[in-house]
Amino acid sequence: MFTALTIAGSDSSGGAGIQADIKTMTANRVYAMSAITALTAQNTTGVTDIVEVTPKFLAEQLDSIFTDINPDAIKTGMVSSSELIETIADKLTEYHAKNIVVDPVMVATSGARLISEEAIGTLKSKLLPLATVITPNIPEAEVLSEMEIKTEADMEKAAETICNTLGCAVLLKGGHQLNDANDLLFQKGKEPVWFHGKRIDNPNTHGTGCTLSSAIASNLAKGRDLETSVKYAKNYISGALADMLDLGKGSGPMKHAFALEGEYER
């Protein structure tokens, strides 16, 4: 069986973080493993508290995984401290990790910074260059490319700049600022590929970024090329959103198990 590892925070509401990643990986038929970077107290209306793990404990989690069940793909999510980012980068290098998908969570779609400038610097210098592909939103791509993004032409220029600077492929998510469903994949030496999707009118979008990146990792784990993996991941997330799950008082989660019947008759 193919295997995938998520390195991310825990979401007590189950809609994002490692919970969303594990659900996504399982739905995409790969064996999911996790290394937790932080515990969060949160629900659909917001985050109440965050407790980070120590770099030593994160390293021990990664050692335990890589020395026993070597993952076919890895996805990393939000990691808020420079020390933890460096720990992840060191361990991925030590174990010659492959098929690394980095969701560079550092700037909210509102433009607010989610991690410190020091952590952003470590992310850019240590972790992102190890990635097979990174999945920034528009504000994150603006930070990485050091340019303003207002049009699809800007998206292409920014993605090319990031790719050339960091040496990894870039899946730049259009988001609501340009077009809800249009994402751009830029790979070095290849023509840019646009993924044009139909907008799904569902206000419950908690965990979409986590879900997309872990779905890409799942498909890479199964040996698919990057473009096909993105295509399959986009199809999966569209199905999860289209099921119109409605839970909680705020922006709720999507239905990760939309294709699971859940009946186990003899």
Language-model regions: role of each:
Residues 117-192:
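Conserved phosphate/ATP/ADP-binding segment of small-molecule kinases
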Residues 3-6, 26-102, 106-109:
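Conserved N-terminal subdomain of the carbohydrate kinase-like
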Residues 14-30:
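N-terminal basic/disordered segments at the start of proteins
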Residues 7-13, 192-206:
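Short pre-catalytic strand/loop immediately N-terminal to key active-site residues, enriched for Gly-Thr
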Residues 52, 227-266:
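Charged C-terminal helix
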